[in-house]
Swiss-Prot record:
Pfam families from the UniProt entry: GTP_EFTU, GTP_EFTU_D2, GTP_EFTU_D3
Protein name (record): Elongation factor Tu
Binding, GTP: 1-7, 62-66, 117-120
Location(s), subcellular: Cytoplasm
Length: 365
């Protein structure tokens, strides 16, 4: 929340940790004048900083405005592994604090650590305990483990000014991030998934699908499922090739061709995925968080209403679907963010947190 000290804290973290573990400090004004970014055509003000702790290297995002966080999280390719919620001890939780926690819940931030800022300005221990209790209650309301959530008491400004007592609290915060937020699973260790981009028949050998392996590893001889658009089917991978070379396996990040046993060219199409059996399911109806582009961002000039039928672009393909709006919402204006329920005309392989774009006549909405 504005003036609770998010940006000062970001500057303090980079400064204190650079002193202790190396790396570069970032001044407040370097972070505060967040450059405008164009992510998928959406204008977002955001500052990216990086820092090292004793155990890890962190990438950290600081956004000036609430709307910027929403846009950042909806469009961001990177999943947030955790968040630092900054609350000023002098004010306690404000309406924006609740919004930030709700936002974390909506976009699937798995872990929150609380930094209670400006504690140098509060002498009253009981007041600090009261603020902590209020924050814990709020977290619990939104299904975060309020009782277990670590709360670090500190002063970002004093730490930034080099006061050793408060610098130590920044180190405490860093240690807490290391211990409380689990190390995310690398994409190579996750179950195999390949969004299909193209399908070929190779006479005498069968059908080859091509695409970039999104996660995991596919080995020759393994069983795979073909999921989405049609009824889910199973087959065996009989070959993997990359740049015309035959390989034993295809790994996350690689563009490969996968040869499939006994699968006909017409059984399979772009927009389906190849996956490790049982790891992803097809769905027609889903709940989503959507940011609607403003006119300036190249979006619509007019609102849309329930029953709107655009195209929904998932991974490699467009599918038509229709929109249901929340109760009491009549229309959606360009620039809004909205929770909507969508029903597609074909099933698509989906899991929680999957990103998609809404398009109309070839342009993004």
């Amino acid at each position: 929340h504005v003036d609770h000290g998010k940006t000062t804290l970001t500057a303090a973290i980079t400064t204190v940790l650079a002193k202790k573990y190396g790396g570069s400090a970032r001044a407040f004004d370097q972070i505060d004048n967040a450059p405008e970014e164009k992510a998928r055509g959406i204008t977002i003000n955001t500052s990216h900083v990086e820092y090292d702790t004793s155990m890890r290297h962190y990438a950290h995002v600081d956004c000036p405005g609430h709307a910027d966080y929403i846009k950042n999280m909806i469009t961001g390719a990177a999943q947030m592994d955790g968040a630092i919620l900054v609350v000023a001890a002098t004010d306690g939780p404000m309406p924006q604090t609740r919004e930030h926690i709700l936002l974390g819940r909506q976009v699937g931030v798995p872990y929150i650590v609380v930094f209670l800022n400006k504690c140098d300005m509060v002498d009253d221990e009981e007041l600090l305990e009261l603020v902590e209790m209020e924050v814990r209650d709020l977290l619990t309301q939104y299904d975060f483990p309020g009782e277990k959530t670590p709360i670090i008491r500190g002063s970002a400004l004093k730490a930034l000014e080099g006061d050793a007592v408060w610098e130590e609290k920044i180190v405490d915060l860093a240690n807490t991030l290391d211990s409380y937020i689990p190390t995310p699973e690398r994409s190579i260790d996750q179950p195999f998934l390949l969004p299909i981009e193209d399908v070929f028949s190779i006479s005498g050998r069968g059908t080859v699908v091509t695409g970039r392996v999104e996660r995991g590893v596919i080995k020759v001889g393994e069983e795979v499922e073909i999921v989405g658009i049609k009824v889910t089917s199973k087959t065996i991978c009989t070959g993997v090739e990359m740049f015309r070379k035959l390989l034993d396996e295809g790994r996350a990040g690689e563009n490969v061709g996968v040869l499939l046993r006994g699968t006909k060219r017409d059984d399979i199409e772009r927009g389906q995925v190849l996956a490790k059996p049982g790891t992803i399911t097809p769905h027609i109806k889903f709940e989503s968080e959507v940011y609607v582009l403003s006119k300036e961002e190249g979006g619509r000039h007019t609102p849309f209403f329930k029953g709107y039928r655009p195209q929904f672009y998932f991974r490699t393909t467009d599918v038509t679907g229709y929109v249901e709006l929340p109760e009491g919402v009549e229309m959606v204006m360009p620039g809004d963010n909205i929770k909507m329920v969508v029903t597609l005309i074909h099933p698509i392989a989906m899991s929680d947190g999957l990103r998609f774009a809404i398009r109309e006549g070839g342009r993004t909405v």
